[in-house]
Amino acid sequence: MLLAVAFVAGCKAGPSAFDNVGSVEGDSVPDSVAVATLVDTPSIALLDPATVGPDVDSAAVVSEESAGEEGVDAEVSTPRPRAPSPAMADGRFPRPEHVRGIYLNAWASGSRNRVNALLELAAQTEVNSFVIDIKDASGYISHPTDLPVAVEVGATEEVRIRDLPGLLNRLDSAGIYPIARIVIVKDPLLSAAKPDYAVQDMAGGAWADSKGIVWLNPYNKDVWDYHVDLAREVAEMGFPEIQWDYVRFADAPASDHARATYPGENGSKADAIRAFLDYSRQELAELGVAVTADVFGVTTTARRDVGIGQVWESFIDVVDVALPMVYPSHYWKGSFGIDTPNAYPYEIVKAALRDAVKRSADIEGAGITRPWLQDFTLGAPRYEAPEVRAQIQATYDAGLHEWILWNPGSHYTEDALEPIGGFVTDPIIRVGNELIPASQRYELTDTVPAVPEELAAEVVDTAATTIRVDTIPVDTIGGGTR
């Protein structure tokens, strides 16, 4: 069975599955800080309930890694898809032909040393884009802002990126395309200060799931406007692309949802998510920015809403880019006919993305599909260059050209990335649970068991409604997760 997991970090999108970031005072980030800001772990994910807590998307706290250092320096395809929105009118950040990026949590983004190291990585490899945390699942806004609601709820009290315009200037000079990640419905600051913005409990007050998490109400237009105002602010600074994470309903068990009510409810959950995405796109259109969304990886295969309001056909034509989190570690045993999904990164990613390509082909004006890929270890085998490169190769073999790597601590496997000038030798990738030269991948893929497409979709639908993949304890993850 498959289990829907999100990144996250959220909701990463997210992109977001482990999107919990440790709150740290001051300019330094101690090594003990749990920097799991995953994109709504959204992701693909089919998780085994026996090994995973909640949805990697939601609050999956992934690794205890230092995101910054002492003395942080604040300066710092579907057939014929619709072309994404153009870059900002000032032309500082032309969109790359194909976005190939990495995620930078807010602490890393605010550290001159970490940014320098990641710019050097990009200069030596195919990486051309950085996803920057503007607001993660902690609710704090990373940069100084005077937005009234942000000030009112205390979202301005933990600045991680002191000079966001300066950071954008550095990325501009380096030829890096910046993407602003903004988490929506998981925001403990906003839900605490304005409980009427949250999902409500039939017994009165804000509703909380069985883990005590209070979720914002996706039907609430004030919630929409708060995040659109933040997106507008960073777009005016120069960001050419806004990436919404945790753009969904809570993925709590049905027993929890029995008490939940949604003031302002109008239409289905999928209608609400579509309405927000369409609204945000229209509101930001004059700025010429692309509007994108992190979604559970399961959405590429599941044929119905699994309770979170994300249905592929419902959102793919109101975003410029959809980013499904297809992390192999998040798939349930038996997904796509594979007993140990994490050991088959090539097969899992290729199967999930082929479903996305097929479904987008039937939708006029479908946005681009750009997956979040796993660059962290969660269970065996350990994810190193062969496992990460296998996912990138699978993305290309599914007919897509773009991807973003997720690691909550923003530490990436350079050997998995194509160097400037190309690989000198055939890269080794994991296919069929073996390490082989990439050119030999087709010799093994035919031996991997598979299940019929309709059965796979049914299994995903069933598992997604029975297991919650919202967070993963830090001590269960090796190297980070999202």
Located regions from the model:
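Active-site-adjacent "subsite" loops/lids of carbohydrate-active enzymes
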Residues: 90-103, 107-109, 169, 180, ...
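C-terminal motif of bacterial Sec signal peptides marking the signal peptidase cleavage site
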Residues: 8-10
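Substrate-binding cleft of secreted/luminal carbohydrate-active enzymes
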Residues: 319-331, 345-350, 355, 359-446
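Glycoside hydrolase catalytic-domain groove-lining segments
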Residues: 263-295, 299-376, 422
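Catalytic domains of carbohydrate-active enzymes, especially glycoside hydrolases
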Residues: 116-140, 235-241, 321, 395-402
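Bacterial signal peptide processing site
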Residues: 12-15
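Aromatic-lined carbohydrate-binding/catalytic grooves of carbohydrate-active enzymes
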Residues: 125-159, 251-258
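An active-site-proximal structural segment forming one wall of the substrate-binding cleft
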Residues: 111-114, 120-127, 170, 212-247, ...
